[in-house]
């Protein structure tokens, strides 16, 4: 899985249940912490 500070192409690249993928300017994405677990 991807590093929390590494670029990611999709939510699937982010580790664990508490991260999500945010896209900023251009095609660059970064993983960030989320308040809710995926699937809840």
Swiss-Prot record:
Keyword vocabulary terms for this entry: Disulfide bond, Ion channel impairing toxin, Ionotropic glutamate receptor inhibitor, Knottin, Neurotoxin, Postsynaptic neurotoxin, Secreted, Toxin, Voltage-gated sodium channel impairing toxin
GO molecular function: sodium channel regulator activity; toxin activity
UniProt-annotated location(s): Secreted
Nucleus in keyword set: no
Tissue: Expressed by the venom gland.
GO cellular component, one term: host cell postsynaptic membrane
Cysteine disulfide links: 1-15, 8-21, 14-31, 23-29
Chief subcellular location: secreted
Recorded family membership: Belongs to the neurotoxin 03 (Tx2) family. 05 subfamily.
Role description: Potent insecticidal toxin that binds to two distinct sites in insect sodium channels, with close affinity (Kd1=34.7 pM and Kd2=35.1 pM). Its association is rather fast (1.4 and 8.5 minutes, respectively for sites 1 and 2) and its dissociation is a slower process (5.4 and 32.8 minutes, respectively). On rat brain synaptosomes the toxin partially competes (~30%) with the beta-toxin CssIV, but does not compete with the alpha-toxin AaII, nor with the beta-toxin Ts VII.
Domain remarks in the Swiss-Prot or TrEMBL record: The presence of a 'disulfide through disulfide knot' structurally defines this protein as a knottin.
Note: Is not toxic to mice (30 ug per mouse tested by intracerebroventricular injection).
Protein name per Swiss-Prot or TrEMBL: Beta/delta-ctenitoxin-Pr1a
Species of provenance: Phoneutria reidyi (Brazilian Amazonian armed spider)
């Amino acid at each position: 899985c991807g590093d929390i500070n590494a670029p990611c192409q999709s939510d699937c690249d982010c580790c664990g249940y508490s991260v999500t993928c945010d896209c900023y300017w251009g095609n660059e994405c970064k993983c960030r912490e989320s308040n809710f677990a995926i699937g809840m």
